[in-house]
Amino acid sequence: MMPFGGIAARLQRDRLRAEGVGEHNNAVKYLNQDYEALKQECIESGTLFRDPQFPAGPTALGFKELGPYSSKTRGVEWKRPSELVDDPQFIVGGATRTDICQGALGDCWLLAAIGSLTLNEELLHRVVPHGQSFQEDYAGIFHFQIWQFGEWVDVVVDDLLPTKDGELLFVHSAECTEFWSALLEKAYAKLNGCYESLSGGSTTEGFEDFTGGVAEMYDLKRAPRNMGHIIRKALERGSLLGCSIDITSAFDMEAVTFKKLVKGHAYSVTAFKDVNYRGQQEQLIRIRNPWGQVEWTGAWSDGSSEWDNIDPSDREELQLKMEDGEFWMSFRDFMREFSRLEICNLTPDALTKDELSRWHTQVFEGTWRRGSTAGGCRNNPATFWINPQFKIKLLEEDDDPGDDEVACSFLVALMQKHRRRERRVGGDMHTIGFAVYEVPEEAQGSQNVHLKKDFFLRNQSRARSETFINLREVSNQIRLPPGEYIVVPSTFEPHKEADFILRVFTEKQSDTAELDEEISADLADEEEITEDDIEDGFKNMFQQLAGEDMEISVFELKTILNRVIARHKDLKTDGFSLDSCRNMVNLMDKDGSARLGLVEFQILWNKIRSWLTIFRQYDLDKSGTMSSYEMRMALESAGFKLNNKLHQVVVARYADAETGVDFDNFVCCLVKLETMFRFFHSMDRDGTGTAVMNLAEWLLLTMCG
């Protein structure tokens, strides 16, 4: 069962986020560590910082390849930079790509992303804050800001680094006195649990965590027809673009093609222009090789004859803006020579130039929980509908003069959270994806609805992720006519648990919201009956059990209910517990005696009989238990509409290990819900949706509930 403390922490986090905590200028203090306060403590006490949250030792290194008994970690010593060199520096002469040399860890994907970051000083210093030094106010403590699943976090580290034979074990700088890159790698390892968790990944993962952007990947051999349009729009938005040529064998790595392009090498795309060439429009693309001096020698390369056949003013403009390592080529040659294109679209807060057009961005958090919201993909029609649902209202079509299609562009990015951290306990990436459906007419304009199984059985998706894949993120750019749509994110298989964020980027303003039920209860007025309305047989049974005082205690109620339920052989039940019976007495007891009289017991019994009818209706396979996936519909039949978060709590509390719900747990859930709703309504007499209570009232409610 989810601990109450976990729920309370989630509520607190939601409130802080609503107040702007997690934005780049107000980053979350990771593990509640305050860099400035910790640094000041160390300065005042004259000590160097040692991080208690990420101690320098075997667990920080890893669990398998870098585990405590691995040959790779034998002889490792943790040392501060001042123990390695005489004059350690944080950054020497500005951050450059030569500051990042790989060590004994397979995290080249991360280092390539850090290297690309050095090309954009403004973005770099969002991640690597100014004012850090091994000289002025040095206290052995540093900090970095990294984007993690929808929010920026400020990560504190000490400067104890793993070494072997007096040299850094992992990333290091070619400038041996410089340590910013090694400390950034340590901060990233801390976020993910240990260094080993960083092994293996995609450069786009690092791009996103250092910018807060969203990545798209294109196979240029199967590119969409409007690939040039996509590149042009991405550059207009200030996106980071990278391209590469696939390697087909180990011998291809860094191999140079006939026209001087390097295989397996990361290039940047920096411009896209149209020129008039011999009376026809020619599309040109500018490429940058950030690591070396090898440049393209084909058409439109430096000094090629094509430049003689365009307007001199165009030639001067295009060639004046060139930097070292940059070259132009035709878009046709680009598509033929290169294999892959990666686009990292920056969110508005990362763009500072006013002339850049911007995505409109919405971020949602969600969870897949076994038994309540982990329905799997469309191949699982019985459970697909229980996945979280998010609505997008596309209001305006794109502004594309050359495009006659009335359509809206938007990008959907689904990212699973914290899976690297799970590697230590055998977890890894789930296979994830999403589908997009048009909202039915009857549900348009409403957020307080969760589309049910029948809708998905009758309707096909309008779009979906290109594939379900076991990467941290899957994203696709989609074009659809203006209208209302829902996005259903899911794992490929049902019952897989994970947290996720869903990001929706639209070119024009749009309305996006989670599609979920409005919490409500259809509570009928209390049943009005008198002793004269009760059958004689029921009275006699009650009198035999209640005795002379004509009231039954919690203990007697347990005996009665379990005796009656035992007669229903079609029900699987462990019987009602004492706590369950206490909750029932709490619901029905009007005089505060903690006992039930004849009329109170009759009303309770009538409720249980009506709930039994509902339970049998949703025990679809007549097994005597109800699937927790049907719990949502059963609760609605009983008058209760709950949102996804509440359903997850209900299933965690009342379902068994196989996600089944037996009759006694079903009744206990309904008793609890009715008690809580009735109490809330009694405290919210004006119907404002808010109840105010003092500490004593709060404790009475929670202790009795």
Swiss-Prot record:
Reaction(s) this enzyme catalyzes, per UniProt: Broad endopeptidase specificity
Active site residues according to the UniProt entry: 108, 265, 289
Region annotated Linker, chain positions: 518-533
Top EC class of this enzyme: hydrolase
Residues reported to bind Ca(2+) 3: 619, 621, 623, 625, 630
SUPFAM superfamilies hit by this protein: Calpain large subunit, middle domain (domain III), Cysteine proteinases, EF-hand
Region (Domain IV) residue spans: 534-704
GO cellular component, one term: cytoplasm
Subcellular location: Cytoplasm; Cell membrane
Domain of life: Eukaryota
Family affiliation: Belongs to the peptidase C2 family.
Biological role stated in the UniProt entry: Calcium-regulated non-lysosomal thiol-protease which catalyze limited proteolysis of substrates involved in cytoskeletal remodeling and signal transduction.
Protein name (database record): Calpain-1 catalytic subunit
Species whose genome carries this gene: Gallus gallus (Chicken)
Lineage of the organism: Eukaryota, Metazoa, Chordata, Craniata, Vertebrata
